[in-house]
């Protein structure tokens, strides 16, 4: 079959899964007084449509910031405004000021779901398809199966089309950025990434690799000639795109400061709910929140994050390569997720999407990671009543990966890109022969564990002494996995150079 | 989930089936209402029909199964299906016993929905097994290297991802999956020359759902000709000497035993006439609420057009025209105004006549399993064209067996593409709520894109599968759909002529299905003469 028809089928399949998931429940359905993210998005439509821009981020009599106040950058607000415009055409009740609070109906749900669907279709899916088509040295079949696996990744589908958010917009823009950089269109790429950053401030997780890669490229071209020119151009692009996004707020310094205060609420604490990051998992043993003062928490988390980022970022700046760039995106986002301040469980999507990008290079590890990342959001999904979609999409994703990449046969050190590392260790360790088997059984063990825990948290009542037993064990187990993945990705990034040099020598 | 187990069970064919995107995975999704608040996807009356049957068979003794009439959806399937519901009801009571109360009309608790939906998915396992058996029968002459271009793989996807079966079973709600599984399994057994097994399966199937009686002539003649006659003359006619009495006795015994098992209790109770009257409700009118795209849809449309013209030019007296025929347009008891009204007997005769040539073909020049399948499809299509009170879903009876032929010969593939596309399109009115609109369009596109591109790549070296006229006809389904679902509801005619989209869909599809039927008939009949010439 031809490439285009296979790609069409892939996209249609992805769309069908998305729409069927969207028929299910959403966050906060029928749960007054606060409802959930669905109501938050609807409320933003209400606010942006009815209030002048000056009041969007301010607490006024018409805009109670304690009730889902706008806390995303301007692009999200504009998007809400656009959706509100369409909503107004269909049914003005949906966005009426004050009276529409907690509005829920079948037709409204249909409308909201459609907005996510359209955003996904316009931004995220084309980026994925183009990215997979641009992969070098891969057969058509591999390209299509990468696209299939990326598009079927359950985490993003469940959060966007089930729980209800617009992550596909910001992640899609970031993908467009990666795509443009891979074609050497650096200016376009940085503009696209600025859009992503202005849609959700969480995209800062990705900003360092972008920065380091582009900076490294400038260095490579020589800072006295072409490199400087490129640097100036890039800086200009970034400033210009930020200025365009923030234009309505530039009237007043107070406006900008207020938006920034809304975007970075440092008084909200080290972590919320049960996140699979290091702080939450540590607090099972030590109650960090009580022991350390908030200011110290902030400094501590900043220091640890910075230290964990440093090696890979330096490496990327010194040796900028596309492959290194993608891997660094993964490791940086993962460091941020594990160590930084005020992390949501949904932020794992920021790691997952870069992992999707390397699924055809390290299919085994990528699949494993993507499964764990979906699993880490299980408590959230259970709360939203998305158990069945979770189970079905996860199984479908696993089987799609197994069928298209034969992941179980790709567990040798070479397939996991660990060859340089193992070579450097040769002599010290002798168990590398057993390596594939060990990795495979670890994977099976982890999948079984995740399955069992999923079933138990869905079906078994926790003992009364530990009401949070299952969420806590889900997040701690995921956190252990993520630490392991962090080490793995750091290793393959840092040992990469020898490999590429070797390859160069060979060629 | 179904897909997973299929993959695990299939051993050798594992990769193939694993690459088939698992239907079970998606089949489970549309019906996920974990929260009563968001019960989103509608379920059809058929959902309530089957709930009611669960309740009837669970609570009442056998003697009252076919008399109970609390709900308007009385039991009107043969006894085996009733027993099937009886068996299901014993599992259902662990999910939600309230669904088994006969008086609980239109009861839909989340547990009920989950159980009923899951029972369809679970029984689909039989369908998947049958597909696997069918794939074994397809000869892999074109052993392509690429798995995506293997006929067996294409066939597996065409059957398992069949758009019609997916939406009718898993969104609209019926148990066609395992019934078609039985049929395909019996076809596969006949192809493997395990005739008795095939006959047994088909006899059982008939007592599950009697609509399959439409294809019974093909089975009867094929078994008689290829099994009871053990040898043929050189010119292909039957050798009368070779008739085996043992074999026909065996066949008769199987049919009688199965029938006795199914109908016996009711004969003993003296309820046979009641059962029969429930199974064949001739009071229901020529066309179903929505006209199935068959000959009678065209006939009624012509009648309607003539009425309108007649009224305009005063050929007809407006007072004499039955009111219903002008306003509702799609009422059950349909009186034709200009053309003569059609009686059940007339449809029966038409069906019989249209089936006859295909049966003769099968008898006079049996071509083995291929001929049998052709005859089967023709029987199903002919009875769809001319039957009394045909449901649009009955088109699946022709589409599924034709899938088997489509991967073996380019000519059949062309016909298959026309028939499936129009036939599936005609199922669109089954799902009419807004949330289902994207699903049906996406699934339809998915299936159409796959069937067109896979068959095209399979017959890459042969001439194009469709000629320009057929292509134009199929492409025009797109504007038709846009008009019916999007443009028309916005126009002021929506209230005055609510039936127009259905009428247009049904008439337009009727043309395509009629064309496919004629084309298949012509190809089968002309093939005879050419084959005979060769023989001479």
Curated annotation (Swiss-Prot), chain A:
Q: Kindly list the residue ranges recorded as spanning the membrane.
A: 4-24, 115-135, 144-164, 169-189, 227-247, 298-318, 339-359, 362-382, 388-408, 442-462, 474-494
Documented EC number(s): 2.4.1.267
Membrane topology value: Multi-pass membrane protein
Which pathway is recorded for this entry? Protein modification; protein glycosylation
* A GO biological-process term: dolichol-linked oligosaccharide biosynthetic process
What is the designated name of this protein?
Dolichyl pyrophosphate Man9GlcNAc2 alpha-1,3-glucosyltransferase
| One Gene Ontology cellular component | endoplasmic reticulum membrane
Q: Which residues are glycosylated?
A: 59
Q: Which family does it belong to?
A: Belongs to the ALG6/ALG8 glucosyltransferase family.
Give the top-rank taxon of the lineage listed in the UniProt record for this protein: Eukaryota
Which residues does the entry place in the Lumenal compartment?
25-114, 165-168, 248-297, 360-361, 409-441, 495-507
A GO molecular-function term, please? dolichyl pyrophosphate Man9GlcNAc2 alpha-1,3-glucosyltransferase activity
Q: Where in the cell is it found?
A: Endoplasmic reticulum membrane
Q: Which reaction does it catalyse?
A: an alpha-D-Man-(1->2)-alpha-D-Man-(1->2)-alpha-D-Man-(1->3)-[alpha-D-Man-(1->2)-alpha-D-Man-(1->3)-[alpha-D-Man-(1->2)-alpha-D-Man-(1->6)]-alpha-D-Man-(1->6)]-beta-D-Man-(1->4)-beta-D-GlcNAc-(1->4)-alpha-D-GlcNAc-diphospho-di-trans,poly-cis-dolichol + a di-trans,poly-cis-dolichyl beta-D-glucosyl phosphate = an alpha-D-Glc-(1->3)-alpha-D-Man-(1->2)-alpha-D-Man-(1->2)-alpha-D-Man-(1->3)-[alpha-D-Man-(1->2)-alpha-D-Man-(1->3)-[alpha-D-Man-(1->2)-alpha-D-Man-(1->6)]-alpha-D-Man-(1->6)]-beta-D-Man-(1->4)-beta-D-GlcNAc-(1->4)-alpha-D-GlcNAc-diphospho-di-trans,poly-cis-dolichol + a di-trans,poly-cis-dolichyl phosphate + H(+)
What does this gene product do? Answer: Dolichyl pyrophosphate Man9GlcNAc2 alpha-1,3-glucosyltransferase that operates in the biosynthetic pathway of dolichol-linked oligosaccharides, the glycan precursors employed in protein asparagine (N)-glycosylation. The assembly of dolichol-linked oligosaccharides begins on the cytosolic side of the endoplasmic reticulum membrane and finishes in its lumen. The sequential addition of sugars to dolichol pyrophosphate produces dolichol-linked oligosaccharides containing fourteen sugars, including two GlcNAcs, nine mannoses and three glucoses.
List all topological domains (Cytoplasmic): 1-3, 136-143, 190-226, 319-338, 383-387, 463-473
From what organism does this protein derive? Answer: Gallus gallus
- By which gene is this protein encoded? ALG6
Q: Which keywords are on file for this protein?
A: Endoplasmic reticulum, Glycoprotein, Glycosyltransferase, Membrane, Transferase, Transmembrane, Transmembrane helix
């Amino acid at each position: 079959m031809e490439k285009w028809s296979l790609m069409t089928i892939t996209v249609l399949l992805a769309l069908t899964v998305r729409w069927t998931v969207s028929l299910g429940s959403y966050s906060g359905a029928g749960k007054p007084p606060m409802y959930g993210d669905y109501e938050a998005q609807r409320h933003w439509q209400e606010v942006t449509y009815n209030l002048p821009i000056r009041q969007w981020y301010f607490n006024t009599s018409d805009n109670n910031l304690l009730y889902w106040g706008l806390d995303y950058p301007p692009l999200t607000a504009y998007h809400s405004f656009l959706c509100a415009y369409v909503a107004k055409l269909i049914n003005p009740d949906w966005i009426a000021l004050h009276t529409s609070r907690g509005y829920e109906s079948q037709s409204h749900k249909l409308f909201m779901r459609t907005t996510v669907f359209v955003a996904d279709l316009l931004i995220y899916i084309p980026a994925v398809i183009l990215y997979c088509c641009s992969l070098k040295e891969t057969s058509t079949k591999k390209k299509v199966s990468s696209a299939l696996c990326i598009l079927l990744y359950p985490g993003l589908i469940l959060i966007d089309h089930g729980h209800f958010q617009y992550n596909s917009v910001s992640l899609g823009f970031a993908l467009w950025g990666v795509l443009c950089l891979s074609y050497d269109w650096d200016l376009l790429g940085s503009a696209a990434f600025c859009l992503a950053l202005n849609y959700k401030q969480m995209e800062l997780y990705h900003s360092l690799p972008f920065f380091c890669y582009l900076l490294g490229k400038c260095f490579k071209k020589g800072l006295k000639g072409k490199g400087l020119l490129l640097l100036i151009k890039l800086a200009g692009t970034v400033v210009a795109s930020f200025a365009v996004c923030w234009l309505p707020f530039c009237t007043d310094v107070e406006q900008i400061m207020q938006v920034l205060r809304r975007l970075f609420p440092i008084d909200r604490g080290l972590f919320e709910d049960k996140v699979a990051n290091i702080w939450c998992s540590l607090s099972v043993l030590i109650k960090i929140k009580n022991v350390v003062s908030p200011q110290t928490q902030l400094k501590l988390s900043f220091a640890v994050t910075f230290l964990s980022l440093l090696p890979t970022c330096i490496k990327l700046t010194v040796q900028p390569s596309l492959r290194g760039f993608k891997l660094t995106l993964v490791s940086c986002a993962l460091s941020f997720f594990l160590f930084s301040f005020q992390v949501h469980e949904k932020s794992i999507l920021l790691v997952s999407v870069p992992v999707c990008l390397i699924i055809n290079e390290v299919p085994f590890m990528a699949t494993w990671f993507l499964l764990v990342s979906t699993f880490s959001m299980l408590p959230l999904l259970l709360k939203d009543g998305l158990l069945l979609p979770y189970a079905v999409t996860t199984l479908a994703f696993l089987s799609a990966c197994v069928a298209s990449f034969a992941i179980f046969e790709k567990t040798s050190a070479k397939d996991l890109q660990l060859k340089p590392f193992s070579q450097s260790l040769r002599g010290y360790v002798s168990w590398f022969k057993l390596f594939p088997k060990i990795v495979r059984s670890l994977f099976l063990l982890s999948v079984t564990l995740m399955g069992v825990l999923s079933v138990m948290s869905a079906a078994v009542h926790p003992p009364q002494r530990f009401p949070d037993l299952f969420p806590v064990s889900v997040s701690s187990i995921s956190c252990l996995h993520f630490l392991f993945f962090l080490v793995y990705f750091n290793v393959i990034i840092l040992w990469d150079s020898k490999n590429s040099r070797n390859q160069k020598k060979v060629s | 989930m179904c897909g997973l187990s299929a993959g695990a069970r299939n051993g050798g064919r594992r990769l193939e089936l694993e690459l088939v995107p698992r239907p079970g995975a998606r089949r489970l999704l549309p019906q996920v209402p974990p929260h009563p608040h968001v019960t989103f996807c509608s379920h059809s009356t058929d959902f309530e029909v089957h709930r009611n049957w669960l309740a009837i068979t669970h609570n009442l003794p056998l003697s009252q199964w076919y008399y109970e009439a609390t709900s308007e959806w009385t039991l009107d399937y043969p006894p085996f299906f009733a027993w099937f519901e009886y068996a299901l009801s014993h599992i259902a009571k662990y999910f939600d016993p309230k669904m088994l109360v006969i008086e609980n009309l239109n009861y839909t608790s989340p547990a009920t929905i989950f159980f009923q939906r899951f029972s369809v998915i679970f029984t689909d396992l039989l369908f998947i097994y049958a597909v696997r058996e069918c794939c074994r029968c397809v000869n892999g002459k074109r052993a392509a290297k690429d798995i995506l271009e293997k006929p067996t793989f294409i066939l597996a996807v065409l059957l398992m991802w069949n758009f019609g079966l997916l939406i009718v079973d898993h969104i609209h709600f019926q148990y066609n999956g395992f019934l078609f599984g039985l049929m395909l399994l019996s076809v596969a057994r006949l192809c493997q020359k395990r005739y008795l097994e095939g006959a047994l399966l088909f006899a059982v199937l008939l007592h599950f759902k009697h609509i399959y009686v439409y294809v019974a002539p093909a089975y009867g003649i094929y078994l008689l000709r290829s099994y009871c006659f053990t040898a043929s003359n050189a010119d292909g006619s039957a050798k009368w000497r070779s008739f085996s009495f043992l074999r026909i006795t065996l066949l008769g015994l199987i049919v009688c035993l199965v029938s006795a098992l199914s109908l016996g209790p009711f004969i003993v109770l003296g309820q046979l006439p009641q059962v029969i009257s429930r199974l064949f409700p001739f009071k229901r009118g020529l066309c179903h609420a929505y006209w199935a795209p068959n000959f009678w849809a065209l006939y009624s449309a012509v009648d309607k057009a003539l009425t309108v013209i007649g009224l305009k030019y005063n050929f007809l007296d407006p007072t004499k025209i039955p009111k219903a025929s002008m306003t509702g347009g799609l009422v059950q008891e349909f009186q034709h105004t200009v053309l003569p009204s059609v009686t059940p007997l007339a449809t029966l005769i038409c069906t019989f006549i249209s089936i006859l040539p295909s049966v003769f073909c099968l008898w006079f020049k049996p071509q083995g399993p291929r001929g049998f399948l052709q005859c089967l499809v023709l029987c199903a299509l002919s009875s769809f064209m001319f039957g009394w009170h045909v449901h649009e879903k009955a088109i699946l009876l022709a589409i599924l067996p034709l899938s088997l032929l489509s991967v073996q010969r380019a000519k059949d593939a062309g016909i298959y593409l026309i028939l499936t596309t129009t036939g599936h399109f005609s199922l669109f009115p089954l799902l009419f709520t807004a949330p289902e609109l994207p699903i049906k369009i996406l699934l339809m596109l998915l299936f159409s894109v796959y069937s067109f591109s896979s068959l095209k790549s399979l017959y890459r070296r042969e001439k194009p599968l469709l000629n320009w006229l057929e292509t134009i006809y199929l492409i025009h389904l797109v504007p038709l759909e846009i008009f019916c679902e999007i443009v028309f509801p916005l126009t002021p005619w929506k209230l005055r002529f609510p039936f127009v989209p259905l009428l247009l869909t049904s008439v337009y599809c009727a043309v395509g299905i009629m064309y496919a039927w004629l084309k298949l008939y012509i190809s089968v009949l002309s093939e005879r003469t050419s084959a005979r010439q060769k023989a001479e």
